[in-house]
Amino acid sequence: MQKIYVVFIFLLGITGVGQAQQKPQYNQYMLNGYLLNPALTGIENYTDIKISYRNQWLGLAESPNSFYLTAHGPLKKDDRSSSIISLPARGKSGIINKLRYKEANDFKFLKPHQGIGGMIISDKMGPYKRLGAAFSYAYHLPVANRTMKLSTGITAGLTRYSLTISELDFGPNLDPVVSQYLDARLLPEISIGTTLYGQHFYVGATVAQLFQNALDLSGMNQGQQQRFPNHYFLMGGTEIRLGQELALMPSILVKYVQPSPVSVDVNLKASYLRKIWGGVSYRHQNAVAALAGFNLNAILNVGYGYEMATSNLINYNHGSHELMVGFILGNSYRIKSPLYFRW
């Protein structure tokens, strides 16, 4: 019965009733804004690699689970504009407090740079599977007398959608109509984004699924196919330092996918010495999440999130778990807490 329930949710998703949730939901986007906004490609001074697994709606058979691998880095980046908290470069002077914040202003005389990256995303919900790969590019242009940067980026790739009939349980008599759901589709996807960021803030916007592809795995709805809607994201955040050891990082994410109502995430993180952090995230009339993590060193960081529904879904599951592991390559400045820490 639970399998049929999951399949019913899937069918809603491809016939338009539930298509507002086409893309997987992550609560660790605060540690990997690159997932949502291609303009962040190459924002750091190093290659940033992240691996994450999300198990959603525990307690429900065949519940959704998602996996992603992302990697991106800069090209010809000579300044340290990505870091709000970092160690000084060798041979440079600067005052370092307990937060390892370099008072010498790294956001002066910024230079333009580029970034490239890529990602692999897998999303599974019972018999329904989605596997995508994409590449991204961004250009970061100094503005405001070279004290801030305005970046614009694009992500382009392919996604394979499929439905495995062998994972369904319809009894001994399988309807021939149902058996047609054996097909798979390979569709292109493009997203564009922009971000304005400075030493203590960022604001950005993204439009995803620009192609608004039509998906019909059965081949039965030709001429009446429902299309994937555009996803619109607005995001912003800042940092508030509380002395030399503590800092607060509030942020917000606004999402709109027609015909669903606007979704708003309000987030707050607190960090101690830029090594240990915890936070909460609230999605209006949908879910609340608790987040925690640590920066082990200048190479490895880990984040964990537990999300609990506040909608009617709370009656059918025991929450969602998400684990993220990050690796940093080419970190010549030994940065332990980069710009994305405020997401």
Predicted feature descriptions by range:
Residues 21-343:
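Subset of outer-membrane beta-barrel
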Residues 4-14:
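Sec-dependent N-terminal signal peptides
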